[in-house]
Amino acid sequence: MKYELKKTNGNARRGRLTFSRPKGEYHVETPAFMPVGTYGTVKGMTPEEVAQTGAQILLGNTFHLWLRPGQEIMRQHGDLHDFMQWHGPILTDSGGFQVFSLGKLRKIKEEGVYFQNPISGEKVFLSPEKSMEIQYDLGSDIVMIFDECTPYPATFDYAKQSMEMSLRWAKRSRDRFDELQNPNALFGIIQGGVYEELRKVSVEKLVEIGFDGYAVGGLAVGEPKEDMHRILEYVCPQIPADKPRYLMGVGKPEDLVEGVRRGIDMFDCVMPTRNARNGHLFVTNGIVKIRNAKYRNDISPLDPECDCYTCKNYTKAYLYHLDKCGEILGARLNTIHNLRYYQRLMAEIRQAIDEDRFDDFVVEFYQRIGKEVPPLQLAKEGENA
């Protein structure tokens, strides 16, 4: 993987990731949003449909794909790309977040995490080394280190111990990744909760180990938005400017805008797909809750400004009807629209940075959705931009 920082506009960054894959070179224009394909599928969508929304790269889930279908069947197909027939780049998370979300079903030790398989009930062990091996078999273009996702709230002492163990696991991840002679990219994950001094140590030590990109983890786990913004404003300037920056598990459209305002290049979230299945649709001027009875007789398109298959062909009344009847097509059409909305938003962001008018775009975006622009404390990046 190669990363090229092409342009900055304030703290917003315009770049390009280049991946060499068996079917040729693939480019990912950044800032980019990655749809989530937890089990090797973006729910309800074919790979062609996902690509038609403008998605350039997908996220797969190491933990879930390890439990089902397992490494052996993946190897028999070739890798995850062959298994799911998506031939563009794939980023896989390390399984850390899923393990830690198991709560009482898991036990964290220095060597790794012991937990109960939520499917079969058997005892299973996942370590940094094992995560690297699974992601190697998945053929992930971007591999994430195995870390502990520090919960919120967490005391300073707990966050410190957690961050320090994540650093030790980062080194073990790096070592095993190198032993496997994996030709793909490995990203470090910055932890430290809401504590700036812990985040500082985490970034410095990860940069010492050396990674192809750096993710900000442990945010969007229940902390106030102000804390997320503060940590991003603190951390982003400390990440080497020539490496991509990835904000994990975020988020709402305004979270993407706020992340870019603070220097983030990559995002992923289940929100557009999960919300679509629940009739919660993102449109140019905010939200449409298609289950609301007021849409029963609404023969207008979902979003007149959207060019997706759903908006070009169907009315709100039809989407309301499909949802009321529990038709699978309703969830599919909603998903097509929400994913296209997210990709259109990212394309608008990239164009605004290209044209040196990102600040104006931010104002326009918040005016459209009827919200105030959140304050930005961060000075323009200088020392390592």
UniProtKB/Swiss-Prot annotation:
> GO MF annotations for this entry?
metal ion binding; tRNA-guanosine(34) queuine transglycosylase activity
Q: Which reaction does it catalyse?
A: 7-aminomethyl-7-carbaguanine + guanosine(34) in tRNA = 7-aminomethyl-7-carbaguanosine(34) in tRNA + guanine
**Organism classification, top ranks?**
Bacteria, Pseudomonadati, Pseudomonadota, Gammaproteobacteria, Pasteurellales
Q: What is this protein called?
A: Queuine tRNA-ribosyltransferase
User: NCBIfam families this protein is in?
Assistant: Q_tRNA_tgt (TIGR00430), tgt_general (TIGR00449)
Keyword list, A-Z: Glycosyltransferase, Metal-binding, Queuosine biosynthesis, Transferase, tRNA processing, Zinc
Leading EC class: transferase
Query: GO cellular component annotations, sorted alphabetically?
Result: cytosol
Identify the residues that bind Zn(2+): C306, C308, C311, H337
The cross-references to InterPro entries, in alphabetical order and at most eight, read: ArchSynthase1/Queuine_TRR (IPR050076), TGT (IPR004803), TGT-like_sf (IPR036511), tRNA_ribo_trans-like (IPR002616)
Does the record's keyword annotation contain Glycosyltransferase? yes
What organism is this sequence from? Answer: Glaesserella parasuis serovar 5 (strain SH0165) (Haemophilus parasuis)
Gene that this polypeptide is encoded by: tgt
Cofactor(s) recorded for this entry are: Zn(2+)
- Short name of one Pfam family for this protein? TGT
List each coiled-coil range. Answer: none
Region RNA binding: start and end of each range?
249-255, 273-277
